[in-house]
């Protein structure tokens, strides 16, 4: 086997096309997209992206809606904390 790419990673398929900064942005997204994530139900690192915004756990077969490239987004975390705060205010 020959030595593979070190810097460009998954964006090596683009060659010299599209510019380095665009390839760098694409690399960041594609690495997040193809990574495995922890399942919030069973706790195993088996959640993979099925389609845009759909994440499937291979272990417990749960399907979760999330972000396009990651399971949870910053906006989703903000919404969760806001809902939690409003719920606490309503109970008090």
UniProtKB/Swiss-Prot annotation:
GO terms classed as biological process: translation
Gene Ontology CC: cytosolic large ribosomal subunit
Binding site residues for Zn(2+): 39, 42, 57, 60
Membership in a protein family: Belongs to the eukaryotic ribosomal protein eL43 family.
Keywords on record: Cytoplasm, Ribonucleoprotein, Ribosomal protein, Zinc
Main location: cytoplasm
Protein name from the UniProt record: Large ribosomal subunit protein eL43
GO molecular function list: structural constituent of ribosome
InterPro entries, A to Z: Ribosomal_eL37/eL43, Ribosomal_eL43, Ribosomal_protein_eL43, Ribosomal_zn-bd
Gene3D superfamilies assigned: 2.20.25.30
Organism field: Candida albicans (strain SC5314 / ATCC MYA-2876) (Yeast)
């Amino acid at each position: 086997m020959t030595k593979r790419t070190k810097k460009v990673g998954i964006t090596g398929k683009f060659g010299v096309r599209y510019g380095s900064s665009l390839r760098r942005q694409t690399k960041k997204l594609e690495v997040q997209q193809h990574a495995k994530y922890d399942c919030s139900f069973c706790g195993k690192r088996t959640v993979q992206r099925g389609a845009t915004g759909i994440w499937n756990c291979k272990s417990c077969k749960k399907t979760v809606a999330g972000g396009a490239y990651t399971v949870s987004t910053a906006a989703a975390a903000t919404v969760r904390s806001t809902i939690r705060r409003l719920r606490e205010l309503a109970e008090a």
